[in-house]
Amino acid sequence: MTEAGSTDRLHHWLTGAAAVAKQAGQLILELYEEQAFETYHKDDESPVTSVDFAANRLIVDGLAALTPTIPILSEEGSHLAFAERQQWPRYWIVDPLDGTQEFIARSGDFGVIIALIENHQPVLGIIYWPPGDVLYTAQRGRGAFRTD
């Protein structure tokens, strides 16, 4: 694929993944405002909520529809061995609710993070902050942007 074709493909994926991040963020914000969630603890004793899992499902489904052949590595998903993951030429990394402790504490400091990795290098990045409806995006070769 030409460099221009690769850049256009990445931009298409960035646009789609940003829409998925915003959808997840809106779900997170609704449940935050309603205080409609349960809290659990992972094996490492860090907190996780039912909102983490709900946002994860939405994001994984959205990314799988956008890019069906690209694997997804999520903080709240299956934990595959590094030996397997290191062979992937391209994959998504997802933190469906970054700042779970802050979410629980109701500080408003939480967000959705999605990145696309190609050949062990980040090529796309998305951070969405639902309380302020602020979206940050970055694409290799095109720069980083904030959208309010």
Language-model region placement:
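DPxDG-like acidic metal-binding loop motif
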Residues: R85-F145
